[in-house]
């Protein structure tokens, strides 16, 4: 779309193509000129401001990229991705590799300060995916959290095989494996803080001299297997400061934050054993069997200090609960209450764990205390067998008081992270916060083991559990994330071997079936709750690819059917190089909130 102008409008009014007498042109113009008030009225219904509210923008808010960037940068291969959420920066990246088959790709990310009346000003350049040897061009996606503007996260997907000869010689991953590269980078601040000024004085003339809060980089890499996990940034980044990573074998919730020594406002983001306060007792009366499970947990940063009386839940909490409840109620009604058995959370959990009833008080360590037992100082509840929690503090220094790196190499569960500052200096991990001085970066990881969860759900909650033999493959899709309650609702598609139902006579050999398990995972306690278990559907003549394709389509349909539009400010900003891989280019870089375009 080109910017509109008066001459365009005049010439367009005088031409009436599209049919005899220009009738087709008039009808098209009528469709294009729908009144703005009507479009705004649709906002009330849909909850979102359509990006096509205005089909064209006036020239005064449209600038050409060639006019604001020196040609040298364009010839250097800069790929411009888009605006940051704040509208202050435009982001671009470059990739470079040698001419021979043994060269690997090097990626750099750039922040440009944008002013509609002047040229772009380069304010930061960083190298992505710290020293990884990447032998094929990557699909890149740069994302920003809904409200956390302090950092961005960059995903690199290796979806195409490298050179065939190189594959054979280097014994690289085959078609059943894909590499995922991730870098989390601090965003340049609008102004220098006191710590940044101290760093500049210590290293005069070095533009990369920044404090840790405004100058850290965190990198990791992992490999996924078929069926390759879906990329869902709208859900994976829905909770600020947290990213959910599907590694094919586990779901890893990672939280990254920067603090200063002695900071009293430090708050653990994951696995803090807090739950939502008990709801006020409901009046006596029969409860409807249609009532779906309610997810009662509340994230610590959103939980105020409750008074002694019964608290009134915030509108956001009530809306989140109502939304989740409506999903399960309608899903059960749509299925006629037969294909999936909806189970409420207050039930004995796997591995001896117990889900807290909404009316039970919370004991030490996040453990539920029955009403008839007096409160007492008990030991914290043991960590469930299906989760693993780690927290490391990364600091700059000479290494005094830090653990040897070999200590962390044996950890096969947590993702390995490399943390550096902008000057390329590695930060060293520590387990104890007490010995930290100055600024430090905290990385929390809470890992949910998929296979453990699958076995526990089948053993405790599946009505067909006695028929089950083994499962051969599974696929995980996130259906919803509630940042208010810290609940993650996931769907586990499962291919398994099971004996036929006893009603089928003469069938003594196991068959291949497909089913789905829905569980809700609490990021505060680490405990999962079985939401529903699907019936067994026999796989007859279908390939695994067609099974997973149908399964993912059903997940998309479910998500879209119950989608609640986010407010205009609470969305995950996403910029990709997808157009480049399709062999085309974006037409404009649009800042939809401030109605500004950069025409490419």
UniProtKB/Swiss-Prot annotation:
Show the ranges annotated as biased composition (Pro residues).
277-295
Recorded hits in InterPro entries, A to Z, give:
DCAF15 (IPR038914), DCAF15_C (IPR047319), DCAF15_WD40 (IPR032734)
Q: State where composition is biased (Gly residues).
A: 13-27
Q: Identify the GO cellular component terms for this protein.
A: Cul4-RING E3 ubiquitin ligase complex
Composition bias (Low complexity) maps to 296-306
**Could you confirm whether the keyword Phosphoprotein appears in this record?**
yes
What does the record give as its pathway?
Answer: Protein modification; protein ubiquitination
Per UniProt, the ranges with Basic and acidic residues bias are 333-343
Keywords, alphabetical: Immunity, Metal-binding, Phosphoprotein, Ubl conjugation pathway, Zinc
Q: Which domain of life does this protein belong to?
A: Eukaryota
Task: Please give the name of this protein.
Answer: DDB1- and CUL4-associated factor 15
- Write the lineage as a comma-separated list: Eukaryota, Metazoa, Chordata, Craniata, Vertebrata
**What's the gene?**
DCAF15
């Amino acid at each position: 779309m080109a910017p509109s102008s008066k001459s365009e409008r005049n010439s367009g009014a005088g031409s009436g193509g599209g049919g005899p007498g220009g009738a087709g042109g008039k009808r098209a113009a009528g469709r294009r000129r729908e009144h703005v008030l009507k479009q705004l009225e649709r906002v009330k219904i849909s909850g979102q401001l359509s990006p096509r509210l205005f089909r064209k923008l006036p020239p005064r808010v449209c600038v050409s990229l060639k006019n604001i960037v020196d040609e040298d940068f364009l010839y250097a291969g800069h790929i411009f991705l888009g605006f940051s959420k704040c509208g202050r920066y435009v982001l671009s990246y470059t990739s470079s590799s040698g001419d021979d088959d043994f060269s690997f790709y090097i990626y750099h990310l750039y922040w440009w300060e944008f002013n509609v009346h002047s040229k772009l000003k380069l304010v930061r350049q960083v190298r992505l995916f710290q020293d990884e040897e990447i032998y094929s061009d990557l699909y890149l996606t740069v994302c920003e959290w809904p409200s956390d503007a302090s950092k961005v996260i960059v995903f690199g997907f290796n979806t195409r095989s490298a050179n065939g000869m190189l594959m054979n010689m280097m014994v690289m991953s085959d078609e059943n494996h894909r590499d995922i590269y991730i870098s989390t980078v601090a965003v340049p601040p609008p102004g220098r803080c006191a710590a940044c000024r101290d760093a500049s004085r210590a290293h005069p003339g070095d533009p990369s001299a920044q404090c840790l809060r405004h100058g850290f980089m965190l990198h990791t890499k992992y490999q996924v297997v078929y069926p390759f996990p879906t990329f869902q940034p709208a859900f994976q980044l829905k909770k600020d400061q947290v990213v959910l990573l599907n590694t094919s074998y586990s779901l890893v919730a990672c939280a990254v934050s920067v603090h200063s020594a002695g900071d009293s406002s430090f708050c653990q983001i994951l696995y803090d054993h807090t739950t939502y306060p008990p709801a006020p007792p409901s009046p006596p009366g029969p409860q409807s069997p249609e009532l779906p499970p309610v997810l009662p947990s509340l994230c610590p940063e959103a939980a105020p200090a409750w008074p002694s009386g019964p608290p009134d839940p915030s509108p956001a909490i009530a809306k989140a609960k109502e939304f989740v409840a409506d999903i399960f109620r309608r899903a059960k009604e749509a299925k006629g209450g037969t294909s999936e058995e909806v189970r409420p959370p207050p039930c004995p959990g796997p591995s001896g764990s117990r889900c807290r009833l909404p009316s039970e008080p919370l004991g030490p360590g996040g453990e539920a205390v029955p009403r008839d037992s007096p409160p007492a100082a008990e030991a914290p509840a043991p960590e469930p067998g299906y989760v693993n929690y780690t927290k490391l503090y990364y600091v700059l220094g000479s290494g005094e008081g830090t653990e040897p790196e070999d200590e962390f190499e044996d950890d096969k569960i947590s993702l390995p992270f490399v943390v550096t500052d902008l000057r390329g200096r590695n930060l060293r991990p520590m387990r104890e916060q007490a010995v930290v001085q100055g600024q430090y970066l905290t990385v929390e990881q809470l890992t949910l083991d998929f296979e453990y969860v699958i076995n526990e759900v089948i053993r405790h909650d599946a009505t067909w559990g006695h028929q089950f033999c083994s499962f051969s493959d599974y696929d995980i899709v996130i259906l919803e994330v509630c940042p208010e309650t810290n609940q993650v609702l996931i769907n586990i598609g499962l291919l398994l071997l099971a004996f036929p139902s006893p009603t089928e006579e003469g069938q003594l050999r196991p068959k291949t079936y497909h089913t789905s398990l829905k569980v809700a995972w609490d990021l505060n306690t680490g405990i999962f709750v079985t939401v529903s278990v699907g019936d067994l559907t026999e796989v007859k003549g279908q390939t695994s690819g067609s099974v997973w394709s149908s399964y993912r389509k059903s997940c998309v349909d479910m998500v879209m059917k119950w989608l609640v539009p986010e407010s205009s400010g609470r969305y995950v900003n996403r910029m990709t190089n997808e157009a480049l891989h399709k062999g085309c280019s974006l037409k404009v870089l649009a800042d939809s909130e401030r109605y500004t375009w950069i025409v490419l």
